[in-house]
A protein has these predicted regions:
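Pocket-lining segment of extracytoplasmic ligand-binding domains
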Residues: 150-258
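Bacterial N-terminal signal peptides
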Residues: 10-21
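Bilobed "Venus flytrap"/periplasmic-binding protein-like clamshell domains
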Residues: 34-58, 92, 116-193, 277-280, ...
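Alpha-to-beta junction loops
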Residues: 80-89, 103-105, 144-145, 190, ...
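Pocket-flanking alpha-helical
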Residues: 67-104, 212-213
């Protein structure tokens, strides 16, 4: 009888172990949704993230879907709705939008840090055509101006704050009619091209302001556009204003993922950075790596975003 009971216990333990393993396998998602912010050339962005897909597919035994949004809002809503699982390069302002809607929606894996000088930030800049007469923001009075996306940090949140302090008013009234028009182009690439083709006298974009000017600096919209099809870009534009340092964007993972799988995703993203850094650089759009980060790094951005939401414009 004792031998029978021992065998029954062993069988029960074996069945329980099999059930636990089956449940763990069932909890492992078969797909991983990688969110990519819009506002850049979609073909290039998807191409730059193919190596990320291949790495995560192999590392996590999943089918990684590249969710390239036409605007920043698509990724924000994807994170809030559980349709986007991980984002490597998130706008701080877009993260603030997620946080203000649901502080527990995502966790910060880390913050992007520049490989060259270990800086943890970048700048919003106003550009004009190199051969234009404009030297300062005041010179753009009465001219057409371009912002990027309403959820962009450097492409709207930061310059909007600066313009309100300098000129008064808001975007809706063109900062007390300082500009003849204020337009959201949809992204940084569109802003730069808008200046080149004469749509805007001035527009905002972003750059690390670290490294070689002629290559578009280590990271930023100039760098991406030069790599794509504008090798002489930096000879065609001129920077007339730059913001104080803005914290680099966070790398995010969704808390909607099962806890065990979420931990694997975080480990895989960090492994991508260290074991295939060239791929990580390609996806980030510049020479960056993952450094430690927390909500505190973005508190000022969150506060500015909250103020903007409460007082639109």
């Amino acid at each position: 009888m004792k031998k029978y009971m021992t065998g029954a216990v062993r069988l029960s333990a074996m069945v329980a172990g099999i059930m636990m393993a089956w449940q763990a396998a069932a909890a492992q998602p078969k797909e991983l949704n990688l969110g990519i912010l819009g506002g850049q050339n979609a073909t290039q962005q998807i191409g730059d993230n193919q190596c990320v897909k291949a790495f995560l597919d192999k590392e996590l035994n999943v089918d990684t879907k590249l969710r390239n949004s036409s605007d920043y809002s698509g990724v924000i809503q994807g994170l809030l709705g559980g349709k986007v699982d991980v984002v490597l390069s998130m706008s701080p302002s877009s993260y603030a939008s997620v946080y203000l809607n649901n502080p527990k929606a995502v966790d910060i894996v880390g913050i992007a840090v520049d490989d060259k000088d270990q800086s943890r930030g970048y700048h919003s800049v106003v550009i004009v055509k190199a051969d234009s007469p404009y030297k300062t923001l005041d010179d753009l009075k009465g001219k057409a101006f371009g912002f990027a996306d309403p959820d962009s940090t450097s492409g709207y949140l930061i310059p909007n704050h600066a313009f309100k302090e300098k000129f008064g008013g808001n975007a809706d009234n063109k900062y007390n009619n300082t500009f003849s028009s204020v337009t959201f182009s949809g992204g940084h690439e569109q802003d730069i091209l808008g200046v080149l083709n004469g749509q805007f006298a001035g527009a905002v974009t972003w750059a690390s302001m670290v490294g070689d000017y002629n290559t578009g600096y280590t990271t930023g919209a100039f760098n991406r556009l030069i790599r794509m099809d504008h090798p002489d870009l930096m000879k065609q534009i001129r920077i007339i204003w730059q913001s104080p340092l803005i914290p680099n964007g966070p790398i995010l993972v969704s808390n909607a993922l099962p806890a065990d799988f979420k931990a694997k995703v975080v480990a895989a993203v960090k492994k991508l950075d260290t074991e295939d850094h060239a791929c990580f650089i390609k996806a980030m759009g510049g020479t960056q790596h993952i450094g430690p980060g927390s909500v505190a790094d973005f508190q000022q951005i969150i506060d500015m975003k909250r103020e903007l939401v409460l007082a639109p414009g």
